[in-house]
From Swiss-Prot:
CDD domains the UniProt entry points to: SPX (cd14447)
Location of the region described as Disordered in the Swiss-Prot/TrEMBL record: 94-150, 185-208, 793-871
Protein name, entry field: SPX and EXS domain-containing protein 1
Gene source species: Dictyostelium discoideum (Social amoeba)
Pfam family, one: SPX
Membrane-topology descriptor: Multi-pass membrane protein
Composition-biased stretches (Low complexity): 94-147, 186-195
Keyword vocabulary terms for this entry: Membrane, Transmembrane, Transmembrane helix
Amino acid sequence: MKFGKKLRFECVSEWHNKYISYGKLKKYLRYLYRSDLKQIGEAEEAHLLINGFPSLSDSQEQFKQLSNSSSPIFNDGSCLENSLDSSIGSNIIQEQSQHQQQAQQQPPQQAQQQPPQQAQQQAQQQAPQAQQQAQQQAQQPEQQQQQDLKESFNDITGYSIDQYEDTSNLDEKTPLISILDQSRPTTTTTTTTTTMNTSAGSGIFKNKKPKQIPTISIPVFSQSERERLFLSKIDEELRKINEFFSNKEKDIILHYNKLTEHCSLILKDRNPSPKVLKNIQKAFGELYKGLTMLENYVNLNYQGFEKILKKYDRLAPMNSSIKLDQMERIKLEKFHSSKSWRNMKEDVELLYCKIFKLDKISIAKKKLAPFSESQSADYHMLKLGFAIGLSIGILAFVIILFTNKSLNQHPDWTRFVSTIPIFRAVGIPILAVWLWGVNVYIWDNARVNYILIFGLDPRTSIDHRRIWKTASFLTAIWLTMFLLFCGTVTGNFALGDVPAQVYPLVLVIFFLSVVFFPFRFFHRKSRTLLFITLGNVIITPFGSTKFRALFLGDLLTSMVKTIFDFEYTACYFFTGDWMINDSTRCNQVNSIALPILSGLPLLWRFMQCILRYRETNNKIHLGNSTKYAVGFSVVLFSALNGNYQAYEPWSASRILWCVCFVLSTLYMYCWDVVVDWGFMWLGKPRPLLRHQLMYKRHMWSYYYVLFSNLILRFAWTLTITRIPFELPINSELFNTITASIELVRRFTWSIFRVENEHICNSIQYHAFDFSEAPWKNEVPKVESPKSLLPLSSSYPYRQDNFNNNNNNNNNNNNNNNNNNNNNNNNNNNNNNNNNNNNNNNNNNNNTNNNINNINNINNNNNNSPSGSNSSINNSFHLGSSSYSYDNQYSIWKKSSKQYYSTSLIDSIKKKFFNNNNSNNNKK
């Protein structure tokens, strides 16, 4: 895989603007070293103007004005005829200049013997000779002359003239820029050339006259200038990467410090609550995810610099390689030389083992891995193909059953119509699973981080293949039950003596068991998260307002018919109507329940918007709540006008209902387009769209959704109201069609809604979420490096320092006043041990919180036994260890807290490795 594609698919999508601009650097190298230039983009031409070089657009405009309109003209303003004439004329001028140079480069003795008059006469004699040679060249045979013209055209332009002999190819974008030899300085001048008369012999262009043409040229740099310009680009990329890396590293350090503090409290508590452990486990996962992303950021940028420098060495002349020197310099840059994030990653693994009582670091790495290692894609695709094939076969039987008149003799349409809502109540959620898989597939291909947006666990989230596999099996079961029911109702076939009304009941029981039973199949963790989110929506004033809860609330507003069908299903089976084949009572109940059930999702979303406004104080949520209030008014007027028939005259309330119907639809459409999708930017380069798009390869989809959403919004309004007009088809079939269309519209809406949310996260470079961490209200946002103060402290032990622990302790005990112990005590409870340390001259009183006094801890020791394995070094500077957090800490960070946190990590490391060594010795 090429590195450009690798960078596009492996980078953190929210940080893509902060990675190395590999594509732009490749274009810039192509500009510096290649003569057959393609069209130079706006960024490259702007760079030329900034550096004081002439722009190509001015020369092209002059060339268009002077070129003949009857000649074949290319898109960049150049003319084929003029280019050929200029090439031939330039060849003649070069020959003349060569003769003059030969005349001037004669031996010095002859030049001294010849008087000036003779030298001038000799030069005048050589000039006609050059003209005679040009005439002889013009009198060559026609085929040879055409071949010479083609060769001269190819040498200058880099393009073959054969592709231009056909006039159909003249409309293609083939720029023609005359470029001077790289060994000479270039100038943009207008020269008069003496061209040969092509009407005599050339079969390509006839009756062409010599004319004054401009020579378009671009700057040709020397090797030193090329190297200087390229290295300036490299320096710009390094500054961008180092600045972003520093900010993200500081942000991770803040959360790392808070994590160690809370872990120390958990270790003190012998029986922490499950909720605390769950929250701290999520915090561990997010911190490890951030460290993994930072590692990915460093590795990809380093590979990018290595690749682009390799390309530079390939294009540059011999003996001008800069790759080795520059890579040594890049290794010393902050983003690559920093060891803080590497050491933190090791410490997080050890701390996770201690908190959750794991024996091996490999187990902790597996649990902390940000992405799960699922089964192979081929395995899931095999199951998916089997289930889809089974579903297609059953669907074919259903179609034959309804289309073949010889089979459909005596159908029981009353029973069939009464059970349509039951099959629809199960079928619409299955369709939603299919559409969710389509959305996940689109987001994955477009690199939209939906996992972060919905707050999912990347270790347990399921991809589109597994979603489609589950949906295909559910579809096969649904079609099987529907086929058996239809065969029994029509009297064509039956499964023994089983009555037709049993099949809908079996389908409902199976569906509920799959959804609610806590078995380890059908993605139990995903189902659990779905029910938790659904509970938050139902108890909205007291629930969560995360994005997934808001998204599920919007989805429920589109599944009003499904909610209504579940109510009908419960009534149909609990009242016993399915035994007597009578749905009269349930229909009467539905006339009352429909307005209530239709308004519940709108009421939930309305309260969610009010709660969001209370939390964020953002007035845009009030506008969103108004949207749902208007929709609720449509439901209210529909309930008041539900008894009207199509032939009855229109009353004032009915007219008001229609007005609310239209206004609510238009209001919701405008809100979808402007706020939820972020469209309607009136300007270039994309009218009616936003500046940044994630689905650029399918630009038509944006304009399609702008049009289709307006039409399908009216279909949604029909799903929450009664239909006060007659229909040419059965009402249950019409409800099924409108419910399916509305569900498709909602999931189409979600594709662009999540895209807009992802772009908002990308603007803030928000790639990991600590919103559920125990310290979510304690850590300030890292806006700029100015909010951080330097703290001269080094990072504690690495794993390779444990074998030399005694040597490190001896190096740190040079300033003791009384005792030379091999180990130090690095606890935050130094004041509690003052009564037992009478020989230390009150060394343990250094528990002040001043940042500048942290280093004084290196001079203090306790009277612990010198050979104790459980002793902990209290020094931050451990011998030759130079692993530091780059001396950057937050202003709110207390020195005593950091002192305790590092001692906690040290103690965990020492105990962990001592236990491992003892186990190895026993073996």
